Protein backbone atom coordinates (compact mmCIF):
# COMPACT_ATOMS: atom_id res chain seq x y z
CA UNK A 1 0.00 0.00 0.00
CA UNK A 2 2.86 2.35 0.81
CA UNK A 3 4.23 1.86 -2.72
CA UNK A 4 0.93 3.03 -4.27
CA UNK A 5 0.69 6.09 -2.01
CA UNK A 6 4.27 6.95 -2.91
CA UNK A 7 3.51 6.53 -6.62
CA UNK A 8 0.42 8.75 -6.34
CA UNK A 9 2.24 11.55 -4.47
CA UNK A 10 5.17 11.30 -6.88
CA UNK A 11 2.93 11.59 -9.93
CA UNK A 12 1.02 14.57 -8.48
CA UNK A 13 3.87 16.69 -7.12
CA UNK A 14 7.33 15.44 -8.10
CA UNK A 15 6.60 14.39 -11.69
CA UNK A 16 3.76 16.81 -12.45
CA UNK A 17 2.74 16.50 -16.11
CA UNK A 18 2.26 20.23 -16.62
CA UNK A 19 4.96 21.74 -14.42
CA UNK A 20 7.75 19.15 -14.57
CA UNK A 21 7.39 17.71 -18.06
CA UNK A 22 5.47 20.67 -19.59
CA UNK A 23 2.99 18.32 -21.26
CA UNK A 24 -0.47 19.49 -22.28
CA UNK A 25 0.51 23.15 -22.36
CA UNK A 26 -1.82 24.18 -25.22
CA UNK A 27 -5.00 23.49 -23.25
CA UNK A 28 -3.23 24.31 -19.99
CA UNK A 29 -2.63 27.90 -21.09
CA UNK A 30 -5.84 28.39 -23.08
CA UNK A 31 -8.39 27.16 -20.52
CA UNK A 32 -6.80 28.69 -17.41
CA UNK A 33 -8.84 31.93 -17.44
CA UNK A 34 -11.58 30.85 -15.01
CA UNK A 35 -11.30 28.41 -12.10
CA UNK A 36 -14.62 26.69 -12.86
CA UNK A 37 -13.69 25.93 -16.47
CA UNK A 38 -10.15 24.93 -15.50
CA UNK A 39 -11.52 22.58 -12.84
CA UNK A 40 -13.93 21.02 -15.34
CA UNK A 41 -11.15 20.41 -17.86
CA UNK A 42 -8.91 19.12 -15.07
CA UNK A 43 -11.55 16.60 -14.05
CA UNK A 44 -11.97 15.56 -17.70
CA UNK A 45 -8.20 15.08 -18.11
CA UNK A 46 -8.05 13.15 -14.82
CA UNK A 47 -10.88 10.85 -15.91
CA UNK A 48 -9.32 10.25 -19.33
CA UNK A 49 -5.87 9.61 -17.82
CA UNK A 50 -7.35 7.45 -15.05
CA UNK A 51 -9.08 5.25 -17.61
CA UNK A 52 -6.75 5.36 -20.63
CA UNK A 53 -3.52 4.52 -18.79
CA UNK A 54 -4.81 1.21 -17.31
CA UNK A 55 -6.76 0.30 -20.47
CA UNK A 56 -3.67 0.90 -22.59
CA UNK A 57 -1.62 -1.08 -20.06
CA UNK A 58 -3.91 -4.06 -20.64
CA UNK A 59 -3.73 -3.62 -24.41
CA UNK A 60 0.05 -3.35 -24.25
CA UNK A 61 0.68 -6.28 -21.90
CA UNK A 62 -1.89 -8.65 -23.46
CA UNK A 63 -1.50 -7.80 -27.16
CA UNK A 64 1.38 -5.51 -28.11
CA UNK A 65 4.24 -6.58 -25.85
CA UNK A 66 6.92 -8.87 -27.26
CA UNK A 67 5.61 -12.43 -26.99
CA UNK A 68 2.22 -11.44 -25.53
CA UNK A 69 0.09 -13.13 -28.18
CA UNK A 70 2.55 -15.49 -29.84
CA UNK A 71 6.13 -16.23 -28.83
CA UNK A 72 8.57 -14.30 -30.97
CA UNK A 73 5.96 -11.84 -32.31
CA UNK A 74 6.57 -8.24 -31.24
CA UNK A 75 3.70 -5.87 -32.04
CA UNK A 76 5.14 -2.96 -30.06
CA UNK A 77 5.65 -1.04 -33.31
CA UNK A 78 1.86 -0.49 -33.16
CA UNK A 79 2.06 1.22 -29.74
CA UNK A 80 1.51 4.81 -30.88
CA UNK A 81 -1.40 4.20 -33.22
CA UNK A 82 -3.11 1.81 -30.80
CA UNK A 83 -2.71 4.08 -27.79
CA UNK A 84 -4.01 7.09 -29.73
CA UNK A 85 -7.01 5.05 -30.91
CA UNK A 86 -7.89 3.99 -27.36
CA UNK A 87 -7.48 7.58 -26.10
CA UNK A 88 -9.66 8.93 -28.94
CA UNK A 89 -12.42 6.41 -28.19
CA UNK A 90 -12.38 7.26 -24.48
CA UNK A 91 -12.51 11.01 -25.18
CA UNK A 92 -15.49 10.51 -27.52
CA UNK A 93 -17.32 8.60 -24.79
CA UNK A 94 -16.48 11.34 -22.25
CA UNK A 95 -17.67 14.01 -24.70
CA UNK A 96 -21.03 12.26 -25.14
CA UNK A 97 -21.46 11.92 -21.36
CA UNK A 98 -20.64 15.60 -20.74
CA UNK A 99 -22.96 16.71 -23.55
CA UNK A 100 -25.85 14.72 -22.09
CA UNK A 101 -25.41 15.24 -18.34
CA UNK A 102 -23.28 18.43 -17.98
CA UNK A 103 -24.19 20.70 -20.94
CA UNK A 104 -22.89 23.88 -19.27
CA UNK A 105 -19.43 22.37 -18.79
CA UNK A 106 -19.58 20.87 -22.29
CA UNK A 107 -20.27 24.33 -23.78
CA UNK A 108 -17.65 26.03 -21.58
CA UNK A 109 -14.92 23.61 -22.69
CA UNK A 110 -15.89 24.02 -26.34
CA UNK A 111 -13.18 22.96 -28.78
CA UNK A 112 -10.78 22.01 -25.99
CA UNK A 113 -12.73 18.89 -25.08
CA UNK A 114 -12.04 17.08 -28.39
CA UNK A 115 -8.48 18.39 -28.16
CA UNK A 116 -7.96 16.17 -25.09
CA UNK A 117 -7.57 13.41 -27.68
CA UNK A 118 -4.32 14.94 -28.89
CA UNK A 119 -3.32 16.38 -25.51
CA UNK A 120 0.26 15.26 -25.08
CA UNK A 121 -0.26 14.91 -21.30
CA UNK A 122 -2.60 11.98 -21.95
CA UNK A 123 -0.25 10.32 -24.40
CA UNK A 124 2.70 11.15 -22.13
CA UNK A 125 1.01 9.35 -19.23
CA UNK A 126 0.49 6.26 -21.38
CA UNK A 127 4.08 6.41 -22.70
CA UNK A 128 5.51 6.77 -19.20
CA UNK A 129 3.45 3.75 -18.10
CA UNK A 130 5.05 1.64 -20.85
CA UNK A 131 8.54 3.05 -20.27
CA UNK A 132 8.39 2.43 -16.51
CA UNK A 133 6.75 -0.99 -16.96
CA UNK A 134 3.87 -0.38 -14.53
CA UNK A 135 1.51 -3.25 -13.77
CA UNK A 136 -2.27 -2.78 -13.94
CA UNK A 137 -2.71 -1.53 -10.36
CA UNK A 138 0.25 0.85 -10.67
CA UNK A 139 -1.11 2.18 -13.95
CA UNK A 140 -4.47 3.00 -12.30
CA UNK A 141 -2.72 4.88 -9.48
CA UNK A 142 -0.34 6.60 -11.88
CA UNK A 143 -3.11 7.65 -14.29
CA UNK A 144 -5.26 9.14 -11.54
CA UNK A 145 -2.24 10.76 -9.88
CA UNK A 146 -0.94 12.28 -13.11
CA UNK A 147 -4.41 13.64 -13.91
CA UNK A 148 -4.80 15.02 -10.41
CA UNK A 149 -1.43 16.76 -10.68
CA UNK A 150 -2.36 18.30 -14.03
CA UNK A 151 -5.71 19.42 -12.58
CA UNK A 152 -4.01 20.91 -9.52
CA UNK A 153 -1.66 22.88 -11.75
CA UNK A 154 -4.35 24.25 -14.09
CA UNK A 155 -6.69 25.19 -11.22
CA UNK A 156 -3.82 26.96 -9.43
CA UNK A 157 -2.93 28.86 -12.61
CA UNK A 158 -6.59 29.80 -13.15
CA UNK A 159 -6.84 31.07 -9.57
CA UNK A 160 -3.72 33.18 -9.99
CA UNK A 161 -4.97 34.47 -13.36
CA UNK A 162 -8.31 35.49 -11.81
CA UNK A 163 -6.51 37.36 -9.02
CA UNK A 164 -4.19 39.01 -11.54
CA UNK A 165 -7.14 40.79 -13.15
CA UNK A 166 -6.99 43.18 -10.21
CA UNK A 167 -3.22 43.67 -10.42
CA UNK A 168 -1.43 46.43 -12.30
CA UNK A 169 0.46 44.28 -14.81
CA UNK A 170 2.79 46.26 -17.12
CA UNK A 171 1.38 46.63 -20.64
CA UNK A 172 4.17 44.62 -22.25
CA UNK A 173 3.52 41.62 -20.00
CA UNK A 174 -0.28 41.45 -20.21
CA UNK A 175 -1.75 38.26 -21.60
CA UNK A 176 0.59 35.38 -22.37
CA UNK A 177 3.70 37.19 -21.09
CA UNK A 178 2.63 37.25 -17.46
CA UNK A 179 1.07 33.78 -17.85
CA UNK A 180 4.42 32.31 -18.93
CA UNK A 181 6.17 34.02 -16.02
CA UNK A 182 3.53 32.68 -13.63
CA UNK A 183 3.81 29.13 -15.00
CA UNK A 184 7.60 29.32 -14.73
CA UNK A 185 7.39 30.39 -11.09
CA UNK A 186 4.86 27.64 -10.38
CA UNK A 187 7.22 25.13 -12.02
CA UNK A 188 10.04 26.38 -9.78
CA UNK A 189 7.79 25.82 -6.77
CA UNK A 190 6.97 22.27 -7.86
CA UNK A 191 10.65 21.67 -8.58
CA UNK A 192 11.29 21.96 -4.85
CA UNK A 193 9.56 18.58 -4.49
CA UNK A 194 12.18 16.92 -6.72
CA UNK A 195 14.53 16.37 -3.77
CA UNK A 196 11.90 14.36 -1.90
CA UNK A 197 12.70 10.64 -1.92
CA UNK A 198 9.63 8.41 -1.88
Swiss-Prot record:
Gene: nqrE
The keyword Chloroplast is annotated on this UniProt entry: no
E.C. number: 7.2.1.1
Primary location class: membrane
Membrane-spanning parts: 11-31, 35-55, 77-97, 110-130, 140-160, 176-196
Pfam families: Rnf-Nqr (PF02508)
Iron-sulfur found in the keyword field: no
EC class (word): translocase
One GO BP annotation of this record: respiratory electron transport chain
A cellular component term, taken from the record's GO annotations: plasma membrane
Record protein name field: Na(+)-translocating NADH-quinone reductase subunit E
Keyword annotations from UniProtKB, A to Z: Cell inner membrane, Cell membrane, Ion transport, Membrane, NAD, Sodium, Sodium transport, Translocase, Transmembrane, Transmembrane helix, Transport, Ubiquinone
Free-text function comment from the UniProt entry: NQR complex catalyzes the reduction of ubiquinone-1 to ubiquinol by two successive reactions, coupled with the transport of Na(+) ions from the cytoplasm to the periplasm. NqrA to NqrE are probably involved in the second step, the conversion of ubisemiquinone to ubiquinol.
Species lineage: Bacteria, Pseudomonadati, Pseudomonadota, Gammaproteobacteria, Pasteurellales
Amino acid sequence: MEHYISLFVKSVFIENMALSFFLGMCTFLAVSKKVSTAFGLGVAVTVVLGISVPVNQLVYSLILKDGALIDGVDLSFLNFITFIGVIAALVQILEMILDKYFPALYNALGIFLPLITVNCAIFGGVSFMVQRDYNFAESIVYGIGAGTGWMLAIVALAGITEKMKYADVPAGLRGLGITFITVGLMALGFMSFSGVQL
